[in-house]
Amino acid sequence: MWRWVRQQLGFDPPHQSDTRTIYIANRFPQNGLYTPQKFIDNRIISSKYTIWNFVPKNLFEQFRRVANFYFLIIFLVQLMIDTPTSPITSGLPLFFVITVTAIKQGYEDWLRHNSDNEVNGAPVYVVRSGGLVKTRSKNIRVGDIVRIAKDEIFPADLVLLSSDRLDGSCHVTTASLDGETNLKTHVSVPETAVLQTVANLDSLIAVIECQQPEADLYRFMGRMIITQQMEEIVRPLGPESLLLRGARLKNTKEIFGVAVYTGMETKMALNYKSKSQKRSAVEKSMNTFLIIYLIILISEAIISTILKYTWQAEEKWDEPWYNQKTEHQRNSSKILRFISDFLAFLVLYNFIIPISLYVTVEMQKFLGSFFIGWDLDLYHEESDQKAQVNTSDLNEELGQVEYVFTDKTGTLTENEMQFRECSINGLKYQEINGKLVPEGPSPDSTEGEVPFLGSLSHLSNSAHLTATSLRTSPESETELIKEHDLFFKAVSLCHTVQISNVQTDGIGDGPWQPNLAPAQLEYYASSPDEKALVEAAARAGIIFVGISEETMEVKVLGRLERYKLLHILEFDSDRRRMSVIVQAPSGEKLLFAKGAESSILPKCIGGEIAKTRIHVDEFALKGLRTLCIAYRQFTAKEYEDVDRRLFEARTALQHREEKLADAFQYIEKDLILLGATAVEDRLQDKVRETIEALRMAGIKVWVLTGDKHETAVSVSLSCGHFHRTMNILELINQKSDSGCAEQLRQLARRITEDHVIQHGLVVDGTSLSLALREHEKLFMEVCRNCSAVLCCRMAPLQKAKVIRLIKISPEKPITLAVGDGANDVSMIQEAHVGIGIMGKEGRQAARNSDYAIARFKFLSKLLFVHGHFYYIRIATLVQYFFYKNVCFITPQFLYQFYCLFSQQTLYDSVYLTLYNICFTSLPVLIYSLVEQHIDPHVLQSKPTLYRDISKNGLLSIKAFLYWTVLGFSHAFIFFFGSYFLVGKDTSLLGNGQMFGNWTFGTLVFTVMVITVTVKMALETHFWTWINHLVTWGSIIFYFIFSLFYGGILWPFLGSQNMYFVFIQLLSSGSAWFAILLMVVTCLFIDVVKKVFDRQLHPTSTEKAQLAEAHSSVKCLDSVCCFPGETPCASVGRMLERVIGRCSPNHISRLWNASDPFYTNDRSILTLSPMDSSTC
């Protein structure tokens, strides 16, 4: 029993095997010794709550937040002891915040419940008792055989058993899982591929042993043990056999598969897990400010308590006769009384901590994140992709970036490969005018044309491809033809490219038809490099036709050749190569390999290695992507050994990856080099301009790529990452720690000696590993003094290590990583902000990123406009919230000096409750959503303005102290201005009476509401109709509410303290004079400071505002005038000169496609930038 309890609490989890055993069709052994493993059902549960646990679970989650818990404690203190304010003052705002959050989360969870019910209730067909049974998806059990028809979604993770194809293969699309739109081929084992009917499957006796569930979509290890005629046949299972839940069946009429993972154990469900939480610099500053204000709160409570007891200790200040202490008070413990009074003062001043700050910030981030997706400037028309926001918690972090780390291929480049050149057996060729010719002839010359290769007209444009007629040639030319033949055969066979049969109705069904003309073939591949190379081979006359029953078919000069595909040695980032083993028509066993020259050339023992290496370097200097091609021929005995090793590695359930790596290492050796290929990956549009803009903004750009040194440097120069005038330093080919350290010291000396010029650093993966191992500080010193850094030959984890090294450096800079492929996920998740490019290498980077965009050039708009605006908005929001709460509570503290620390409240309880909820909340919320202190086009055209907000400047201690001191000074003016103007002089009132406590407090509260609201108006640079509505509407609402609240006797209120108070206040001319005088006095200080700052020490942003205001139409007229009216033109000119701001002119309701930035109907909610013709 105790162990069960510990297991339920998670302290003693039950032992779980590393593998699971699945009996197909749930045919368990009948010997009675087998205990079936327990598996979960196939229900998907994405919801968090049930109808029974919603209230307690949601409350628990909300009160884990420090601010909510703090106000809960204050509320409980008010209930337990005699406090000066009603528990409603803390309880109602807390109830409002908790209720709004609970409703939002409850509604979202209700939507998740509906979605779950729809998915779990979907109809499926399962093979049971020799027939097909219709059931619901949630009823599928592990071991069930499921039938899926064309275009249906797989309801669980299935191991493919058979399909309507003879070879048992099928095509699926995983676009909903990883975003990859290309079709993927999945295969079944030969023994089950022939079982294409329900009756045949009912006779299958087989067991699957596989790993326990894991989230990696591309990793699966298992084996199938089939019993046939009392013999057991073992077949390996890999990712190519697993059909993932959420994927869709394509190009296949139907398949049968056995469920191996169900419900929340499917890979799709395991990927629901959220990424590690990232916290922005603004959030960290906000938490710091909360701690400071908590210290201020406790200090005020302690000071008030001490002063109270100090006063009571003096005999002359004893309690008056009408307020004598009770017997209980005189006999109670002084310590308990001190604690009680301290808690009472704590309750009295607790509103200095803004309860609504968290809710307002959440709403601002949530609503503000939509603007990125609505921005047409971030929409890519060709791919029909708009910007995506995967997390709204980091919007303001986009305005604080100091380092950008970017991948190259697919991020800076288009990832659209075009075959350009190749090297075959030491001879270099290039494509000129559709012909592959040796290097040297002019474009119009045909002399020297390769006799075997012929026309290079594009595959998609030719109805039929024929090679040029072979010329009569001597033996040397015949040998040359054979070498070229073998080279392009290797290119046509060593790949994972697939073919769809182009028909009038789209993708055809059925097996491949090798007699199709090339124009009827369409290649598609997950790697653009492979597609480009296979198409180039086809243009050269060696056409890959397709795969039929594990046979690769190639047309050579119109003659069909069949190669039996024996093994595929898949590509991985560690080996940086892939290989295939095929059996040629002649019966020879051949291995064809292709990969990076650093992984292929060391494995070669023959061929023109030296010449090819030179050609590869020449290709790289042109910025071309290179691959080397090699082959190996096996004897019968060698192949038996290779086949045995691969079988043992692939059927292993433990350490399969390590065993496969060892097997690949053993097999891929003693290669004969055939040549190398060079494909061009052109730069994306406006990459150079974007990188230059980032540099002007003070952001350092690092390029992290897996390409070789020469290719990476060439691309860095072409994209403007490196300048021609820049001094390029290199840390490459380091073999030892000592050599690496010495090279780093030399680089540091060179930078010190040539400190005037800019430096760029190139470092390769091997040298980087040595530098990070023992010489981090020295390496960082060199990097910090370089304007641009290029890291080549990088492994995915090395990219993440580099970013982490920068993150933990003493300066703690904000980092941003941008990439497009699965190998970029680690660095995207490591950086403070991760940007995924929705490119051609799937959607893994976009799915794991914080933001996703279609092109690198959109990064400038994302940072310089959205990031700038978001940071300005939320930084002002945070500072303003603390400012207005200091204004709110400080008069309460000052009032205690005049009421002898009796804990008498200055404000009415209703005003205490509604101050942050109703009277002052909307103006700052709208400001934080639509404020544009400068035109977006100016921000993009002047990247240097980005420097003004760097280093979290608006939330620095200096800025925090300014807002805090401003709040205290305004509070002193509120209190003492009211006290000296109307609080002491009875002649100011017509009836000869002094203001009472509630009238005095209401006067202070009225001045405060008006002042903090107009203060928000002074901070606003971009006025829309909704700004006017909430700003002036908040003040009007306060007056209407106060008249309504104080003008009626409310029967349900315990006291009528405010009855007729506000009406009496407004009836006094001296009160109106005091309100106007105090508001002007408070804001005059702020206006004077702004004027002097702009005249004496203007920032770059303020200079741009002034320049923009002078060059624009006087747009302040729109605040108070209709078009054509000019009563306020002179006021507008004066204010524009002083503070350099404007508001949009009268705007038509007609939307224009040329309108910049957002596409909203601007007459409803103007979220667009200030029109350049107006401001």
Curated annotation (Swiss-Prot):
Topological type in the membrane: Multi-pass membrane protein
Catalytic activity: ATP + H2O + phospholipidSide 1 = ADP + phosphate + phospholipidSide 2; a 1,2-diacyl-sn-glycero-3-phospho-L-serine(out) + ATP + H2O = a 1,2-diacyl-sn-glycero-3-phospho-L-serine(in) + ADP + phosphate + H(+); a 1,2-diacyl-sn-glycero-3-phosphoethanolamine(out) + ATP + H2O = a 1,2-diacyl-sn-glycero-3-phosphoethanolamine(in) + ADP + phosphate + H(+)
Localization of this protein: Recycling endosome membrane; Early endosome; Endoplasmic reticulum; Golgi apparatus, trans-Golgi network
Binding site for ATP: 407-409, 530, 571, 594, 625, 705-707, 793, 799, 823-824
EC number: 7.6.2.1
GO terms, biological process: phospholipid transport
Annotated TM spans: 69-89, 91-111, 287-307, 338-358, 862-882, 910-930, 963-983, 994-1014, 1033-1053, 1060-1080
InterPro entries listed in its UniProt record: ATPase_P-typ_cyto_dom_N, ATPase_P-typ_P_site, ATPase_P-typ_TM_dom_sf, ATPase_P-typ_transduc_dom_A_sf, HAD-like_sf, HAD_sf, P-type_ATPase_IV, P-type_ATPase_N
Active site positions: 407
Organ and tissue specificity: Expressed in retina, brain, liver, testes and kidney (at protein level).
Keywords assigned: ATP-binding, Endoplasmic reticulum, Endosome, Golgi apparatus, Lipid transport, Magnesium, Membrane, Metal-binding, Nucleotide-binding, Translocase, Transmembrane, Transmembrane helix, Transport
One GO CC term on file: endoplasmic reticulum
MF (Gene Ontology): ATP binding; ATP hydrolysis activity; ATPase-coupled intramembrane lipid transporter activity; magnesium ion binding
Alphabetical list of Pfam families matching this protein: Cation_ATPase, E1-E2_ATPase, Hydrolase, PhoLip_ATPase_C, PhoLip_ATPase_N
Domain of life: Eukaryota
Principal location listed in the UniProt entry: membrane
Binding site for Mg(2+): 407, 409, 820, 824
Cofactor: Mg(2+)
Family as reported in the entry's similarity comment: Belongs to the cation transport ATPase (P-type) (TC 3.A.3) family. Type IV subfamily.
Protein function: Catalytic component of a P4-ATPase flippase complex which catalyzes the hydrolysis of ATP coupled to the transport of aminophospholipids, phosphatidylserines (PS) and phosphatidylethanolamines (PE), from the outer to the inner leaflet of intracellular membranes. May contribute to the maintenance of membrane lipid asymmetry in endosome compartment.
Quaternary state and interactors: Component of a P4-ATPase flippase complex which consists of a catalytic alpha subunit ATP11B and an accessory beta subunit TMEM30A.
NCBIfam families found in the cross-reference section: ATPase-Plipid, ATPase_P-type
Official protein name in the record: Phospholipid-transporting ATPase IF
